């Protein structure tokens, strides 16, 4: 919604409301941020200072943007006041008040709740006797390390103190290999507890459901309060199915016997329901086990319609039977005594688990206090403690904060938890209420962060029925999307989302209302289902893929290819995107598109397919950081530095570019020793090969292994004596690996990843954690927990398709949205664990009988699983809502099916529902979002082609949604692929051979002849460069008579001849590919020049001072020891004992060393170009030195070459020195009087005329 838009009545109400609490339910695209900013502006204009408002945002970025928008609005208001009344000055009260708000904006309480809590603690730390000197753990890594360290200590203590009981606890949640299962559970339980206002109290209540004492099971509080409602719901569901079966049978006039059977079954269910609250467990178990439905007539001869209706009726009846079987196997699998025995044993386990968690909680807090650190959870708990402590200081602090804030404003209210709610409620006033809460519970998708959308829902219902508690206003207008996106969203969610299954009623108030006034009425409005079929009766044998070398062997590839082809089709359209800013249609841009994925599993496939279609793409977190090649290699190397006797990481390093062995060479090593571990085989080869028969192949392997083992020994020594960060950086430097990955595809990203590993090691050691073994172990734990290192920022192409998770898309919008992988199965991991957690239901565990070693599900686990499953489905619905409402103009729902007939047959179960909302059974039975969407659209008239002989009980005849279904399979997708390649990449030879006949007049013919016969007058210059270094062109001066090019090259020679640039004949191998460490003469020469440059000329130059200079360069790691020891110290001393050297030492202020220069000279002096060529070449270089004397400038150039005669230096380098002299002459005309080459090995000067 643009800022200039007139506010709707509901928006005006939100902006103007005051005098009570206000809950704003803001649907997607309803302009809630704009409304929130305007509400703040109204309060400022009414006299409230901005620091009198507490504005809580969900992220730091949101807070930053809000401040920026407020600053912009305040400045606009100031400009408006001065424009409306030019006589008004900046000293006027209104403008002065607004300028004051700009000054206060920097200290305004517009931030996340964590940031606000930090300010409260820093202000009122004395209330709870907190040491004010603390550090915030902004990096989660250090917190995890401390947590692991503390738990290791607590666990050892529990093993010693609790003995058998703790052993039973460990066995219940771990396995024979490790007790990591218990560790993970302790941490999960701790995190859950920390999200509540009273962690200790919440933990203490966890064993209560297992408390049955001596009373009957069905009389226990657990049964009556938690299990009974679930059983009633199950029976109610079966009765509803039977009523639907009875209605079908009655309407179709089926045989009376059928109606009798159904009535009997219904009566049995009614009796069961009545007895659920009062009968004993064993009585209920018997009734459930013996429930039966009599035989029903399924076919009616010569009456196909009755047969069809009987089939529909049978579907309902089969559903009842299946549900009753599940009830028997899930709830009533054991008799009462068995259940009680299991509950008693499980209670002791849960009690011990709670005690262990409390001990860990206490020890963790103590360790953080000892280290003077706090984490984000501490901020909220300490703030709550400050506000609720039973002392005068606490009461005074609370009173001050309440008095300070005229209003408490909470953005994204649906994503807070009960702890945060407690803090906000304390800060708010009671009479009148001053809380402003805005959000959309339909977009609450952060359950994994322990957000609690039920808090929003409770207030929504409470304010609706008790207006004295607060007001509620719904912002239903969607100003983001075209009408059809709203229609499809309403069509789907009005059938899917209700309180029993989705936690929320998607009623008329929740419907998206079309808000924009600027979209053209004739704008295309179709939304699409893109369905890739994996099994059809078509064959791919007739499709030639030779041109593409491409096949589809993965359903994900098929659906992604369909999307790529759709994007290309959009690209080919003439201006398909409407630009609302200027009211015109414009061409399609790749950045108009976002692909929303449920997980990152197929991101690499997206990159691969899109690359094939030349579609630029930006993928956030294309793969897990730990799975990138460079990080896996580094982690493998660190692992074997810690312990080389690990086959997998060892082979990974040997195969990597650091060593460079190929598969055959790895096999060759293993053949040398087939029985021992691989490192022993490597060592055996290294020690035995030199004494055996040598081969060229073996020599190659030996050279690499020798280098590797040398480096490994050095690295292991470094690891013992240095920090991890030093080790990692030395690995980068000595192997050249950091430079190597920079040359790989996405090199900058890979280098950033390696730098991130270095930074992570630095953070690790800053937290007082030491040791390579512990660091490697920590990284492995991070991988096991699916915790990633800080993502390194990669460069992105702004003009590219965006790929992101649905969570990552929240708050964003794009003209074209593809919701991907809708057939992905819901994640059931949380329901399969041996311990299920829920804030309300508590904990449900699987119990391991210590005698029989058999695991039994407990009834609290059954209850908790139902609660967790319901919340999971509700969150999946909300994720789908978020994904669909990101679309502005075009929306595509993408999924994979077996074939359309099979899919629509499954989706037609929606026909049995009598009302708009689909039956709970059908929605709960769905295993992915595509089935939800399929059932919801199935009753729409657009899908009539797939109805077959069936007809929905409730038809959506008046729904305005425009829907299209596009089907694809391997045949059609490959065919379109072939056409796309043929269209966009025609064969070059084919184009050349095309015969084109045209008529041209003589004038055109003469003009074309002139063009074809044109000769560029500076053709020779196109084969030269405009930039050269002295070292590159020095050969031209060795023999000026030697032509660089043939005088009259042939056409073929012109085509094949490279550009004239004089360079060295080869490039140095990277360090990790070198097999020797011996310094080259060039390296020694460069080092000698460096020493000559660094010598202090104000002191005597002798062997001691020269060696001291060399030692200093080695100490500073400018020179290596291997190079330094080869520098001829005596030759340097000899230079300064010469006449010129003595003159230099006598006038150190007059000598200039290592002087860089640039010089423009005519190209014809260097290259074989036309003498009339006027182009010039830029020469750059560095002059070794020159001395200012009374007679002029004396130029000298050191040489370390070993030559037979000094004159050879003159032959080789005279031209180079002449260039130096020309450069000096251009700076000091007429002053260069002497030019010398000095041979350091022969200790003689060679004059250059």
UniProtKB/Swiss-Prot annotation:
HAMAP family: AddA. GO terms for cellular component: cytosol; DNA helicase complex. Its cofactor is Mg(2+). One of its GO terms (biological process) is double-strand break repair via homologous recombination. InterPro entries: AddA, DNA_helicase_UvrD-like_C, DNA_helicase_UvrD/REP, P-loop_NTPase, PDDEXK-like_dom_sf, PDDEXK_AddAB-type, Restrct_endonuc-II-like, UvrD-like_ATP-bd. Signal peptide: none annotated. Its EC number is 3.1.-.-, 5.6.2.4. Residues 521-811 form the UvrD-like helicase C-terminal domain. It comes from Lactiplantibacillus plantarum (strain ATCC BAA-793 / NCIMB 8826 / WCFS1) (Lactobacillus plantarum). One of its GO terms (molecular function) is ATP hydrolysis activity. Belongs to the helicase family. AddA subfamily. This is ATP-dependent helicase/nuclease subunit A. Heterodimer of AddA and AddB/RexB. Keywords: ATP-binding, DNA damage, DNA repair, DNA-binding, Exonuclease, Helicase, Hydrolase, Isomerase, Nuclease, Nucleotide-binding. The heterodimer acts as both an ATP-dependent DNA helicase and an ATP-dependent, dual-direction single-stranded exonuclease. Recognizes the chi site generating a DNA molecule suitable for the initiation of homologous recombination. The AddA nuclease domain is required for chi fragment generation; this subunit has the helicase and 3' -> 5' nuclease activities. The keyword Isomerase applies. The gene is addA.
């Amino acid at each position: 919604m643009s800022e200039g838009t007139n506010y709707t009545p509901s928006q005006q109400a939100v902006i103007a409301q005051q005098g009570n609490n206000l809950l704003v339910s803001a649907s997607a695209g309803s302009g809630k941020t704009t409304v929130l900013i305007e509400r703040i502006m109204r309060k400022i204009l009414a006299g409230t200072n901005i620091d009198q408002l507490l504005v809580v945002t969900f992220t730091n970025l949101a807070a930053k943007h809000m401040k920026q928008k407020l600053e912009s609005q305040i400045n606009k208001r100031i400009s408006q006041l001065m424009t409306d009344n030019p006589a008004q000055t900046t000293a006027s009260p209104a403008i002065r008040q607004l300028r004051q708000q700009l000054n206060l904006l920097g200290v305004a309480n517009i931030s996340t709740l964590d940031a606000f809590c930090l300010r409260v603690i820093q202000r009122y730390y004395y209330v709870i006797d907190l040491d004010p000197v603390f550090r915030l753990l902004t990096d989660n890594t250090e917190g995890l390390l401390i947590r692991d360290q503390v738990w290791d200590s607590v666990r050892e203590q529990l093993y010693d103190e609790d003995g058998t009981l703790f052993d039973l606890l460990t066995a219940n949640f771990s396995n024979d290999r490790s007790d990591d299962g218990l560790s993970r559970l302790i941490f999960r339980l701790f995190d859950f507890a920390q999200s509540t206002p009273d962690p200790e109290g919440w933990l203490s209540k966890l064993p209560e459901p297992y408390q049955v004492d001596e009373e009957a099971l069905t009389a226990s509080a657990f049964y009556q309060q938690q299990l009974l409602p679930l059983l009633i719901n199950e029976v109610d569901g079966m009765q509803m199915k039977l009523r639907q079966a009875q209605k079908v049978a009655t309407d179709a006039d089926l045989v009376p016997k059928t109606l009798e059977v159904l009535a009997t079954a219904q009566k049995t269910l009614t009796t069961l329901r009545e007895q659920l609250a009062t009968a004993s467990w064993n009585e209920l178990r018997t009734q459930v086990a013996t429930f039966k439905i009599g035989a029903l007539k399924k076919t009616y001869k010569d009456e196909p319609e009755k047969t069809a209706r009987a089939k529909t009726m049978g579907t309902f009846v089969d559903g009842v039977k299946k549900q009753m079987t599940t009830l028997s196997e899930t709830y009533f699998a054991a008799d009462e005594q068995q259940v009680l025995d299991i509950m008693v044993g499980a209670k002791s386990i849960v009690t011990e688990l709670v005690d262990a968690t409390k001990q860990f909680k206490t020890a963790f807090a103590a360790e953080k206090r000892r280290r003077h650190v706090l984490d984000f959870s501490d901020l909220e708990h300490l703030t709550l403690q400050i506000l609720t402590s039973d002392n005068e200081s606490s009461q005074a602090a609370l009173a001050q904060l309440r008095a300070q804030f005229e209003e408490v404003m909470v953005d994204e209210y649906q994503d807070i938890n009960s702890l945060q709610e407690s803090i906000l409620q304390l800060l708010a006033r009671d009479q009148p209420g001053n809380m402003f809460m805005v959000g959309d519970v339909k977009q609450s998708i952060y359950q994994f962060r322990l957000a609690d959308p039920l808090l929003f829902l409770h207030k929504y219902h409470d304010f609706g029925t008790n207006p004295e508690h607060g007001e509620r206003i719904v912002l239903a207008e969607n100003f983001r999307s075209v009408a059809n996106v709203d229609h499809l969203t309403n069509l789907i969610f009005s059938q899917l989302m209700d309180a029993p299954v989705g936690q929320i009623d998607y009623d008329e108030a929740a419907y998206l209302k079309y808000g924009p006034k600027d979209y053209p009425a004739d704008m295309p409005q179709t939304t699409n289902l893109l369905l890739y079929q994996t099994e059809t009766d078509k064959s791919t044998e007739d499709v030639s893929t030779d041109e593409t070398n491409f096949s589809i062997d993965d359903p994900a590839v098929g659906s992604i290819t369909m999307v790529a082809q759709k994007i290309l089709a959009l690209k080919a359209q003439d201006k398909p995107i409407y630009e609302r800013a200027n009211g015109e249609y414009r061409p399609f841009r790749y950045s108009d598109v976002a692909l929303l994925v449920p997980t990152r599993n197929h991101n690499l496939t997206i990159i691969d397919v899109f690359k094939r279609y030349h579609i630029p793409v930006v993928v956030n977190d294309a793969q897990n950081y730990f799975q990138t090649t460079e990080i896996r290699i580094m982690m493998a190397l660190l692992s074997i530095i810690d312990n080389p006797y690990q086959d997998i990481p060892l082979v990974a390093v040997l195969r990597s570019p650091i060593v460079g062995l190929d598969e055959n060479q790895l096999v060759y090593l293993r053949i040398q020793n087939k029985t021992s571990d691989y490192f022993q085989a490597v060592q055996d080869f290294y020690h035995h090969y030199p004494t055996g028969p040598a081969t060229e192949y073996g020599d190659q392997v030996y050279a690499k292994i020798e280098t590797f083992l040398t480096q490994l020994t050095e690295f292991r020594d470094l690891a013992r004596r240095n920090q991890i960060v030093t080790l990692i950086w030395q690995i980068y430097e000595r192997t050249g690996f950091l430079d190597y990955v920079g040359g790989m595809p996405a090199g900058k990203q890979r280098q950033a990843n390696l730098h991130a590993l270095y930074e992570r090691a630095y953070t690790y050691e800053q937290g007082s954690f030491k040791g390579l073994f512990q660091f490697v172990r920590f990284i492995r734990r991070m991988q096991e927990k699916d915790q990633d290192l800080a993502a390194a920022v990669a460069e992105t192409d702004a003009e590219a398709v965006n790929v992101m998770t649905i969570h990552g898309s929240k708050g964003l919008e794009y003209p074209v949205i593809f919701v991907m992988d809708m057939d992905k199965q819901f994640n059931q991991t949380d329901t399969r664990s041996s311990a299920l957690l829920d804030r309300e239901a508590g904990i449900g565990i699987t119990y391991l009988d210590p005698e029989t070693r058999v695991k039994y599900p407990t009834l609290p686990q059954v209850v908790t699983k139902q609660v967790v499953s319901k919340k999971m489905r509700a969150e999946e619905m909300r994720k789908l809502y978020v994904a669909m409402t990101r679309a502005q103009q075009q929306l595509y729902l993408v999924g994979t099916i077996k074939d359309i007939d099979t899919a629509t047959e499954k989706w037609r179960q929606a026909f049995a529902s009598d009302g708009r909302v689909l039956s709970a059974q059908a929605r709960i039975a769905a295993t992915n979002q595509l089935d939800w969407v399929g059932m919801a659209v199935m009753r729409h008239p657009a899908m009539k082609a797939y109805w077959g002989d069936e007809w929905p009980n409730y038809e959506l005849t008046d729904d305005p949604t425009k829907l299209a279904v596009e089907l694809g399979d391997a045949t059609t997708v490959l065919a379109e692929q072939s056409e796309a390649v043929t269209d966009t990449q025609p064969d070059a030879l084919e184009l050349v051979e095309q015969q084109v006949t045209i008529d041209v007049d003589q004038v055109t013919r003469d003009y074309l002849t002139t063009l074809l016969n044109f000769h560029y007058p500076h053709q020779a210059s196109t084969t030269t460069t405009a930039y050269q270094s002295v070292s590159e062109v020095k050969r031209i001066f060795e023999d000026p008579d030697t032509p660089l090019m043939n005088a009259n090259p042939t056409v073929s020679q012109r085509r094949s001849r490279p550009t004239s640039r004089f360079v060295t004949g080869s490039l140095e191998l990277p360090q990790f590919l070198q097999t020797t460490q011996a310094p080259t003469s060039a390296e020694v020469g460069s080092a000698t020049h460096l020493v000559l440059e660094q010598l202090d000329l104000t002191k005597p130059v002798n062997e001691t001072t020269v060696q001291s200079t060399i030692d200093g360069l080695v100490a500073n790691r400018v020179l290596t020891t291997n190079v330094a020891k080869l520098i001829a110290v005596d030759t340097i001393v000899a230079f300064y004992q010469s006449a010129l050297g003595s003159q230099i030492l006598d006038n150190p202020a007059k000598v200039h060393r290592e002087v860089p220069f640039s010089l423009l000279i005519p190209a014809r002096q260097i290259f074989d170009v036309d003498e009339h060529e006027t182009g010039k070449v830029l020469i750059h270089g560095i002059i070794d030195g020159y001395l200012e004397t009374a007679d002029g400038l004396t130029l000298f150039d050191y040489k370390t070459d070993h030559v037979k005669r000094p004159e050879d230096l003159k032959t080789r380098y005279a031209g180079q020195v002449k260039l130096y002299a020309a450069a000096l002459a251009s700076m000091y005309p007429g002053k260069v009087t002497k030019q010398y080459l000095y041979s350091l090995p022969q200790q003689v000067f060679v004059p250059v005329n």
